[in-house]
Amino acid sequence: MSNLTVFVGGSVGKDPRSPKTWSGSCAPFLDALNSAGILNRAVGFAVPRFHNSLLLAKNFNRNRSIWRSHYYFDPAYRNALTRAARRIPVHTLFLLQLGHMFSLPQAFPDKKCISYHDGNLSERLKSGFGLAGLSAKRIDQALRYEEQVANQMTAVFTFSEYLRQSFVGDYHVPANRVFNVGGGINLTEIPPIRPDKTYSAPRILFIGTEFRRKGGPQLLEAFRIVRESIPDAELHIAGPTGLETIPDGVHFHGHLSKADPAQRHKLESLFRDSTLFVLPSLYEPFGIAPLEAMVYQLPCLVTDGWALRETVTPSLTGDLVPKGAVEPLASKIIELLSDPQRLAAMGRRGREHVLGEFTWDAVARRITDTIVSI
């Protein structure tokens, strides 16, 4: 078939396989499309350097986070990125873009254009994360842009049913043009199953670069309560570059990059040696880390919200806790760690669930089937 061109543009420069975007999912996603025989090519692009400098100057703010968001939310930046996309020659009927940063329908009105998303600004606004200090004007401009572009698409693909419903309800895209094709894990190799894995050691694992958004402070509070009942409990934290304090029983491993062999090996060992994965996020559009934990036979305790409800099944592959609630989180951790046999059963079911539903090969098959239908 090979009738699909994938466009990756914006913050990642001109490398469509950059590990710095899309939570590191670009390369495995493109590899799966290629293996499925649907990918013609993937292209990366950026705003020309001089114009980009002008846009950066226009949106300058002493706060780098606000500066970055105002720049990316600026309609002038998104229009410039769309013009950059238009200059790329295409020879396929179907074009797919990752995210909302530009508009393929505007660049190629004679093509069938699709966008693919793990989140959107509407859901981010509801969460309140990452928008402090941004002007209401910029937020409104970006929100309108996303809605406009989504409605121009031949089809919109989402990582989850939760997000599919957001595009239909918040952006008013007709339901028959929004498809939940799922998302996948970003493991270069699937670890072998371990029939002899034991769960007697009370060893908790947390992985998340954005410590506050991922519920790290709430987990630390809950862990203090857990240690009162299980004094030898351990909490291993990877992802953030630093912690203000490291309480007793907490093992801090810093940021671990899969691109670095030694750090990837350390990350793999944390997955192998832990008995429970906990991610009490305050906002989590999708959540790849819990899926990867389940491949390592780790039951997952996550927030009862967003797409996490679709990936973790209570009492079967893990459990759900209310957002931001410390005591229920602590109680559930104690309950799970106190029942190693239950953890083992959850771990087996979780691995089967992820390998059956949440691989990029499975996503590529769904995309192929959907494209044929449109």
Stretches found by the model and what they are:
Residues 135-156:
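Membrane-proximal helix-turn-helix segments that form the acceptor-binding/catalytic region
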Residues 162, 184:
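Carbohydrate-associated surface elements
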Residues 196-214, 220-227, 235:
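Conserved donor-binding/catalytic core segment of Leloir-type glycosyltransferases
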Residues 239-276:
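Nucleotide-activated donor-binding/catalytic signature segment of Leloir-type glycosyltransferases, i.e.
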Residues 282:
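Aromatic "clamp/platform" in nucleotide-sugar-dependent glycosyltransferases that forms part
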Residues 299-303, 312:
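Short hydrophobic beta-strand element within catalytic cores of glycosyltransferases
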Residues 314-315, 319-326, 335-340:
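Conserved acidic donor-binding segment of nucleotide-sugar-dependent glycosyltransferases
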Residues 328, 335, 342-357, 366-369:
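A short, well-ordered alpha-helix in the C-terminal region of glycosyltransferases
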